[in-house]
Amino acid sequence: KGEKENLIEIAAYGEGALPHICANGTGIWYQDYGIRLDSPAHVYRGDVSSAVLLYDAEYIWIHDLEITNKDDIDRQSVAGKTSGEARSEIAERYSAPHKMDRTGVSVVAQNSGTLHEITLQSLMIHDVDGNVYNKHMNNGGIYMTALKPDNEEQTGIARYHGVTVEDCCVWNVSRWGIAVGYSYQHARFAGAQLQEEWFLKYGHENIVLRNNYVKNAGGDGITPMYALRPLVEHNISDSCATEM
């Protein structure tokens, strides 16, 4: 963790190409919301491969990196085949229910209460071959979640206060392009009308999604969730839901 006046910074320096974090299915961690989700069909726990994982981290600024998490075995398996055979096999592979959940950047709040000032800026995230079905697992380009704490009474409700995702290019990812905020507290936000106090206690505040470009996401493009008046401006989402 950083501090308000002393942020942790992870970024490129010097000249030349951006540093490239290439996960290729490594960086595996176990995600568990600790509670079933809003649909019994939605997966709520399992292994996830993330190129970058920020777990209970705050006061952190990550910028100017290239990030990928490819399924190279799938790509190599269709080499040399006819276009029809290749298309058929690719379709079968991307829709396989057992396909690994993958993320470019995963951010997780769980055992540290409210997390503050997390900034992702000028990241080039592409070729993240995740599972198109597991929509609320950390699955896609950038995905931030809040999981049930081990001891909520002691550590507090897991939530975010101050998230900025800005100037990022995200392409060829699945399932999500950019998602901020799916939470184990989802049941508290099921009504048609919600009080501001619920967001201040159980949801997220000061969420900014600005100047991002998402192209060819397998599912959703850019989504804030359970956030009080998030600022979403000057983003472009192009050719999304390509695997739906």
Language model regions located:
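Hydrophobic alpha-helical hairpins/lids featuring a short glycine-rich hinge
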Residues: 109-113
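Short flexible/disordered coil segments
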Residues: 82-94, 98-104, 194-196, 239-240, ...
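Short, well-ordered amphipathic alpha-helices
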Residues: 1, 105-106, 121-122, 142-145
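Extracellular beta-strand solenoid repeats
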Residues: 9-11, 20, 53, 61, ...
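Right-handed parallel beta-helix/beta-spiral solenoid domain characteristic of secreted/periplasmic
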Residues: 2-98, 122-134
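Right-handed parallel beta-helix
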Residues: 7, 14-16, 58-69, 91, ...
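Short glycine/acidic-rich loop motifs that flank beta-strands on beta-rich extracellular proteins
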Residues: 25, 31, 48-51, 71-78, ...
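C-terminal extensions
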Residues: 115, 137-148, 160
